[in-house]
Amino acid sequence: MKPAPLILAFDVFGTVVDWHGSISREVAALIPGEDGDAFATAWRAGYKPAMAEVRSGKLGWTKIDDLHRRILDQVLLARGHDLDESRRQHLNRAWHRLAPWPDTLQGMHHLKHHFTLCTLSNGNLGLLANMAKHAGLPWDLILSAEVFRHYKPDPQTYLGVAEVFDVKPAQVMLVASHEDDLDAAAVCGLQTAYVARPMELGPGVRTQHGDLSRFTVAAQDFNDLADRLTNAWPTQLPT
């Protein structure tokens, strides 16, 4: 059996919070007649390409708030919307107001009794702090790509968590709903927990997944994850 993880580091967008549903609702409220689902999908589609520019060095270090704003302006132009600056700023900060999944808070509070919980997100620190306040997320520490000046899946992000807590990489478990994130963490020696989020991309959109047995644990939601982890290491966890 692997050693009990001491630190659970969580991906946030899609794993902890429902970005698609939250953004869709904000768009529909701000831009009457707009298809919120389609807008959310288009906005998110620019996320990885924008980070790739930073990771490649084509673009200097740029926090996610600023990347989101750049993509937002492009999506608004492409979809024929001329919002004033105030409304653009309000909509861009919708990423600070994302709603948690229904199981998130209960599962996290259960896990918090046994593990140290932190974020490992590409979101910037201010965004993650505001989101935690808005959604009531009980983090012990907020860590971000901004801390390491590297975006996931750069190894510096995963190994950075172990360095911050002064533990071995194997004592950190990444919790995520994205297999590529988990695979990159595993290469760095972290343990991995896959959590299914079938509605992440919106209604009617399903993603195919590979063999989940390659991960340390695979769970249906955060409550299931808490049960699996506490059952796997019943004598090693503090009471």
Residue locations for each model-derived region?
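Active-site neighborhood of HAD-like aspartate-dependent phosphohydrolases
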Residues: M1-A45, L76-A78
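Asp-based, Mg2+/Mn2+-dependent phosphohydrolase catalytic module
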Residues: K2-L6, H109, G123-T239
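Tryptophan-centric aromatic hotspots in well-structured domains and transmembrane helices
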Residues: W19, L98-W101, W139, F215
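Alpha-helical elements of Rossmann-like donor-binding domains used by nucleotide-donor carbohydrate transfer enzymes
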Residues: S22-A29, A42, R70-Q74, H90, ...
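Hydrophobic alpha-helical core bundles mediating ligand binding, dimerization, or RNAP-core interactions
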Residues: I23-V27, W43-Y47, H68, L91-W95, ...
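A metal-dependent, Asp-based hydrolase signature
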Residues: D35-T41, A45-Q89
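Substrate-recognition element of Asp-dependent hydrolases with the DxDx(T/V) motif
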Residues: E85-H134, I142-A145
